Design a protein with these regions (language model features):
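Extended, low-hydrophobicity, polar/charged segments
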Residues: 1-160
Length: 160
């Protein structure tokens, strides 16, 4: 959690350092698809992780980390979180909840420290994800990220 005076990438770096987490932030051109983004970064689509913000009915949020080529399984995630209703908030609510615009969202440096749920397929790999700013991505060891956030690891996705 940060005070909002830093840029997105600076917030990511500061939070990662505070957690003892090694991240590599790169600049990259915009991509029109998951496959194009993977090609630009020299990785496979499954190694690109989407940080999705989900809103619970009590107006609290959680981060759901989902690998490329997969989507949230709403029944699985609702059961895991013990709620009857979840939704993806609109862009303005996601920004208010995290301090990041869609396409840049990451739990690192979020303006509010929401719980993190990681799909089981992400564990054990080096992944890329949003770095707090458009035109940047970060690389991180998924297991180290999971430990840094004391994240819940579970089967929360299904194929797209």
């Amino acid at each position: 959690m940060t005070d909002g005076t830093l840029t997105g990438a600076e917030r990511v770096r500061a939070d990662a350092a505070a957690r003892g987490l090694e991240v590599e932030i790169i600049e990259r051109p915009a991509a029109r698809s998951l496959e194009e983004a993977a090609e630009i970064m020299g990785i496979t689509p499954v190694d690109i992780v989407k940080s999705l913000v989900v809103k619970k009915s009590d107006d609290t949020y959680a981060f759901a980390l989902v690998p490329g080529g997969r989507k949230i399984s709403w029944p699985k995630l609702r059961a895991l979180l013990g709620v009857n209703k979840l939704q993806l908030p609109d862009a303005s609510l996601a920004l208010a909840a995290t301090g990041y615009e869609r396409g840049t969202i990451t739990p690192l440096g979020s303006t509010t420290a929401w719980p993190v749920v990681v799909d089981v397929t992400i564990a054990g790999r080096r992944v890329s994800m949003g770095a707090g700013e458009h035109g940047r991505s970060l690389f991180v060891d998924a297991d180290a990220l999971i430990r840094a956030f004391d994240a819940t690891v579970a089967d929360i996705t299904e194929p797209e």
